[in-house]
Amino acid sequence: MERKIDMKDLEDIEQLLINVDMVNGFVKHGAMADEYIMHIVPEHLKLMNDIVKKGEAIAIIKDTHKENCREFDRFPTHCVEGTEESELIEELKKYENDALVYCKNSTSTMYAPRFI
């Protein structure tokens, strides 16, 4: 789901917390997962709570690949669209409905639809 924000809302935003790749496939399980990342989750939650309390914005960027993604020529198959790996970790899901959400099919967020 995406949060609908118009240009007036964007002009009122003073802070934007960008959350990148905190998905199950990088944090909890799968070929690209590194469970050590979990050690930053408590601080991440604190930052997200602070931003929400201030009425500021959160952007969530999720690694979400098509099954035939060219990236899989260089990296193991991971975070395929529609799988649990491509979902935000449970600890952060409560923010997803109120965030700007972008799904990227490459290593670069710049190629995510509607990002720029």
Can you annotate each of these PLM segments?
Residues 104-116:
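Alpha-helical scaffold elements lining the catalytic groove of polysaccharide deacetylases
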Residues 1-105:
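Active-site acidic carboxylates
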